[in-house]
Amino acid sequence: MSIKTPLQISHPLEFYEDKYRKAVAPEWDLRILNNVFDSVVESDIENMYENIFSEIWIDNFKKSYEFSKANFKRVQLYLTTPILYFSAELTWLFSAQVVPNDEIISDKFWKKIFAFPEMVLSSKRSKPFMKLQNIIFDENLLDNYRKYLFWDDDLFYKVYDIETIGHEFGHTLWLDIDTQSIMNSKTWVFKNIEEFKATTGWLVAYFMGKNDDDLLSESVIRDHVIRTIWLLSYKKVNEIEPYYCEALIHLSILNESWIISLDNNKISLNFSNYDNLKRI
C-alpha cells in the first residue's frame, strides 16, 4: 500500500470464489500508470457526502462521519493498465477495484483505487453485437449506446469517471470501522447492500452536482440502465449475489421513475423522465 511509483503491485483481489468463507481467489498483477484522462469525480463524491451529513446533523453520527471522511481523504487513485498478471480464474479482469476491502487494515494502510479505463473501452469495443441485446433493448437505445461507445472516447471516459471510479469512491463512505464485521457476524449480508450503496453514491453525487450537459447525463443513465439489466444475469451465481441484489433495487427505482419502459417487449429509455429519477 505504501508503493506510489508508476508501477503498482496488486494484492489478492475481491473475486468471490468461495461462497461459504467469502474467500478470494489468488489474483496478482503488475500495473503501470496510464493517465488517459484526469479524474474529477472525487470532489463531487465528497461534496455529496458533506451535504447529506449536514442535513442529518453530523454530530448525530460523528464517529462514522469522521472515520469515513478520513478514509476518503487518504485514498490513492491510479489509472493503470495491467502488464503482468497471475490468476486462478481470468473471469473479472478488469473494471476497477478499491483495495483493501478490510476497514481495520485500511485504517492503518489507507486505500487505493485502481481503474483501467483504456482496457475497459478496448474490451467493450471488441465484443460482438449479440442477438440477445436486440431482444432485450429497443433499437434506439442500442444505436445511441453504440455511437457513444465507438465514436466518442472523451465521452466514454467522462462516464467511466462518474460511474466506475465514482462507484469505488462510494465504497469508502458511510462506514464505521466495524460495520462489515458486525453485519457479517449476524447475516453475511454486508456485500448484498454494499454494492448498491456504492453505485447509489455516485448517482446521488451526480444528481447533486451542477451538471447541465444533457448528452453526458443521458449517456450516464443509458449506461447505468444497461449495466443494471446485465447484472440480473447473476441471479443463480451465489458467489457474486451482491451484484444481483444491487440490480434488483436499481431496476425497481428505474421502473418507478418511468425512465425505462417496456415497449413491444423491449426496454426503452425515456430520458424525458430524468427529473423523476433524480427526485426518487
Where is each model-derived feature located?
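Long, well-structured alpha-helical subdomains associated
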Residues: 157, 203-280
